[in-house]
């Protein structure tokens, strides 16, 4: 596969078209049909700002003619737990009941092999590192360990915040018009998959949510693209929405912030992947916004949206991607869905590199655990907490390497065990935050970001 370059975005069309902020209808396993919509939730960066303040801030930013540098993170959470031995840590010499149906293929880095179902990722292996020895997880179906660095019990008991909320708390926004943390997780049927919020830091550090059911949030079905051409039109429209909200008593602090965020047309445009060059969007592929099982959608627009968001200054974007809880028909499931994953993730990695963003945007891809070495009677792999693989790209880290290894059955770490908290420590260090510092929560209590034994993965720096 040849290298590809980002294509300049076309100038906005003068033709009349609609900007859709409401996703397609999808149906959950419980049979309830729901719509995904743009939900602007708790937002720290715009708290207390009026629409006039936002407009003035935008004018100042425009006159400055530049933007400050920042570090961003895109985390792709693989809900359900990806089978590592069928994707990034194959064991072709193991017995058939362990190695399964898939074969390894060479990558563009000598000595590194991955699954035959990931040919595009194989051709950009020089742009990421694989940690094949991630340990320390509990057997719990939740995003909490991946997103907070703590177990679900610890997170709920102690109010541990999402790493995105912690980064928002410590570093704040890159500018007053841009939220520091946007969570693209949909509302998944299995509730522990859903992203935890700011916890003890307080609701003001909750992410902007791109899906949800909060009645007091903004729900916009369509906004005419041409309305964004004139600033006054947008402000008048938002003021009309505010007046209507006041009448029904729905004007909470978070609702106020929703209007402030929407006053920034650059954020709205970043969320509109229709504005991307068609060739770039085609490279990402599409997938579907429909949820898989009780997990996330296999929807590559999320990955493209994440890149567009970090470009406009969002510090953290979290994505829930696919459903990998393959207790049965593991190989049929992977043959159907890994090609879409391969297309989307390789596009994100290559796109960031081609745009020169690979030094500033860290990409972390992992689930809550791995899968069992031995294939079960239903041709599936069950939960396996002892080890999994994480993929790390961008952020200026060292790439084209494998860190750690597993035993002959991919069941346990054989060399260089990396605790999952070390991955979170790596994220914090990469964005310039000491993972062991204390911050003040909403009650002015000092809380540690991570335990003292969490250490950044040294091989990446």
Predicted features and spans:
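Ligand-binding pockets and gating/stacking loops
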Residues: 2-4, 11-461
């Amino acid at each position: 596969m040849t290298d590809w370059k980002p294509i300049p975005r076309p100038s906005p069309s003068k033709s009349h078209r609609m900007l859709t902020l409401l996703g397609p209808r999808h149906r959950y396993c419980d049979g309830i049909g729901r719509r995904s919509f743009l939900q602007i939730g708790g937002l720290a960066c715009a708290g207390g700002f009026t629409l006039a303040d936002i407009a003035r801030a935008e004018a100042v930013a425009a006159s400055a003619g530049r933007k400050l540098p920042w570090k961003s993170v895109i985390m792709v959470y693989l809900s359900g737990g990806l089978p590592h031995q069928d994707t990034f840590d194959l064991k072709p010499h193991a017995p058939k009941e362990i190695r399964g149906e898939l074969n390894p293929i060479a990558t563009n880095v000598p000595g590194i092999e991955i699954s035959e179902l990931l040919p595009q990722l194989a051709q950009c292996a020089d742009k990421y590192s694989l940690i094949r020895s991630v340990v320390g997880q509990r057997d719990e179906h939740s995003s909490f360990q991946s997103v907070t660095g703590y177990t679900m019990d610890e997170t709920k008991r102690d109010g541990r915040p999402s790493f995105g909320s912690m980064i928002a708390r410590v570093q704040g926004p890159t500018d007053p018009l841009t939220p520091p943390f946007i969570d693209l997780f949909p509302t998944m049927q299995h509730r522990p998959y859903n992203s935890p919020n700011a916890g003890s830091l307080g609701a003001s550090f909750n992410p902007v949510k791109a899906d949800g059911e909060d009645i007091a949030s903004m729900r916009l079905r369509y906004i005419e693209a041409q309305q964004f051409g004139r600033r006054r039109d947008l402000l008048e429209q938002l003021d009309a929405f505010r007046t209507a909200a006041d009448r029904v008593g729905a004007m909470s602090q978070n609702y106020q912030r929703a209007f402030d965020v929407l006053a920034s047309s650059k954020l709205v445009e970043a969320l509109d992947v229709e504005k991307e060059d068609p060739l770039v969007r085609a490279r990402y592929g599409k997938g579907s916004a429909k949820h898989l099982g009780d997990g996330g959608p296999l929807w590559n627009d999320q990955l493209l949206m994440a890149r567009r968001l970090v470009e406009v200054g969002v510090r953290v974007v979290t994505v829930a991607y696919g459903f990998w809880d393959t207790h049965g028909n593991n190989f049929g499931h992977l043959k159907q869905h890994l090609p879409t994953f391969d297309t989307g993730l390789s596009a994100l990695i290559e796109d960031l590199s081609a745009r020169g963003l690979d030094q500033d945007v860290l990409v972390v891809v992992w689930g809550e655990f791995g899968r069992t070495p031995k294939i079960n009677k239903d041709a599936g792999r069950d939960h396996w907490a002892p080890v999994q693989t994480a993929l790390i790209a961008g952020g200026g880290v060292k790439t084209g390497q494998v860190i750690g290894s597993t035993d002959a059955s991919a069941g346990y770490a054989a060399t260089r065990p990396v605790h999952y908290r070390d991955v979170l420590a790596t994220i914090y260090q990469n964005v310039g935050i000491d993972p062991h510092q204390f911050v003040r929560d909403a009650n002015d209590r000092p809380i540690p970001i991570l335990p003292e034994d969490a250490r950044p993965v040294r091989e990446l720096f």
